[in-house]
Design a protein with these regions (language model features):
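Cysteine-nucleophile active-site neighborhood
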Residues: 38, 43-111, 117-119, 163-173
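Catalytic beta-strand/loop cores that center a nucleophilic Ser/Cys/Thr
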Residues: 108-149
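Conserved small/polar residues in nucleotide/adenosyl-binding loops
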Residues: 174-181
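Phosphate-binding active sites in nucleotide-utilizing proteins
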Residues: 2-57, 61-62
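A glycine-centered loop/beta-turn motif at secondary-structure junctions
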Residues: 143-173
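Hydrophobic anchor at the start of a short beta-strand
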Residues: 19, 69, 151
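Active-site-proximal beta-strand elements of phosphoester/diester hydrolases
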Residues: 1, 112, 152-156
Length: 181
């Protein structure tokens, strides 16, 4: 938990998920003792590099254990850091609803809700990371996935309600019996 909103917990419960919230400093052993089907990397405030100081190693170890991971907002940025990427402060952050994002896999445009001032840097992104979504405002990275692993994230709030519902499929993807496809 990097600062999860109550609406996100409701979002997962709508999909019949059993959710256990743990501190962002919880050890990998403790997380694994809960026998999770997946780990959600939540949103939260601040600079991802500051939070990443203690979260990156935990995320890297979960990836090694092949635990499915799904991150949003700050969780997206910290996941990128854990995978060897970089983040930077944006000149102008993305705030509010109605941000068009292109899904580079389906070619669909999704209208999203966003609230962030940092972004994942495109240059020198490791080759094992696939960019899955981009902003149609400024071409910034809005989604990534780790190739050949059930690990993915988006920069925006797919659960935003009231608000755009174009990205609600992420919970279905994450909670499906085979999130590796």
């Amino acid at each position: 938990d990097y600062g999860i909103k109550k609406n996100i917990l409701r979002y997962f419960s709508d999909f019949k998920c059993k959710v256990t919230v743990v501190s962002c400093r919880t050890s990998v052993d403790k997380i694994l003792s809960l026998k999770p089907n997946g780990v959600f990397l939540s949103n939260g405030p601040g600079d991802p590099a500051a939070t990443g100081k203690y979260a990156i190693q935990i995320i890297q170890n979960l990836i090694k254990k092949k635990i499915p991971l799904f991150g949003i907002c700050l969780g997206h940025q910290i996941l990128a850091l854990a995978l060897g990427g970089k983040t930077k402060k944006m000149k102008l952050g993305h705030r509010g609803a109605n941000h068009p994002v292109k899904n580079l896999i389906s070619e669909n445009v999704e209208i999203t809700s966003q609230n962030h001032g940092f972004e994942v840097v495109r240059e020198n992104l490791p080759k094992n990371i696939q960019i899955t979504h981009k902003s149609l405002f400024d071409n910034s990275i809005e989604g990534i996935r780790l190739k050949n692993n059930p690990v993915f994230s988006v920069q925006y709030h797919p659960e935003s309600n009231p608000g755009p519902q174009d990205s609600v499929y992420f919970c279905l993807l994450y909670t499906s019996p085979s999130p590796r496809d």
